[in-house]
Amino acid sequence: QLQSSAASDVYKRQHGSSFGVVPGDGREPITTDSVDATEIAIEFTFHGLYSVTAFGIDQEGHREDQVIEVMIEQHIDWYENDTGTPEEFVFDSTPGNEGPIPSHFLLNSTVQNPSIIDFDGRDVDVRWDVVNQEGVCQTAGENIGNGDTGFWKTLHFGPLSVHEIHLVIEDGQDRIDVHHSLEIIYSESG
């Protein structure tokens, strides 16, 4: 009896409890011994809705699982200063795990027409286009006075694919400052 108890204690020390996670993005499970750590950090590379399985294994080898829904959204800030030919801002709204598509993306775009000369500055006409594989899906234009700032805020529902934001100077001074702020957003219900 005494030997059996001692052997059991040795087994439990060598094979203690452990815990881990299955990230839900195709990676292998991440497991650690509870003696070595009390938490596991997971980093996701791509936006999406992930079903993460957290699990614990006791000293007798019994496993308990709990599924946790994790929502990873993406925020991108794109800047160009003193440009006469703004570059295309390209992003992919496809989820990184082949899961449900985003609810929408929100674009806040700011264009500044800096005042080069305090008197006799020029206006600039700009046009924004949101382009997907089917062509232009949204567009807007604005005349921005010398030293002024123009804004465009738009939503695009159910986006799934690569999108491009084109900003074109249609008329006026050559140099502008650009800031695109983009959020890829998922709904709570998936």
Task: Describe the residue ranges of each PLM region.
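C-terminal edge strands of extracellular/lumenal beta-sandwich accessory domains
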Residues: E60, D123-E134, P159-G190
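Low-complexity, Pro/Ser/Thr- and charge-rich linker/hinge segments at domain boundaries
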Residues: I72-S93, S189-G190
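Acidic, Ser/Thr/Pro-rich low-complexity intrinsically disordered segments
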Residues: E88-D148
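Extracellular Ig-like/FN3 beta-sandwich strand-entry sites
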Residues: H47-S51, P102, L160-E164
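Hydrophobic/tyrosine-rich beta-strand signature of extracellular beta-sandwich/beta-rich modules
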Residues: A54-G56
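Short acidic/polar micro-motifs centered on Gly/Asp/Asn
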Residues: H15-S34
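Residue-level recognition of secondary-structure-to-loop junctions
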Residues: P23, S34, T38-F46, Y50
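Single conserved hydrophobic/aromatic residue that forms the stacking wall/gate
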Residues: Q1-A7, Y11
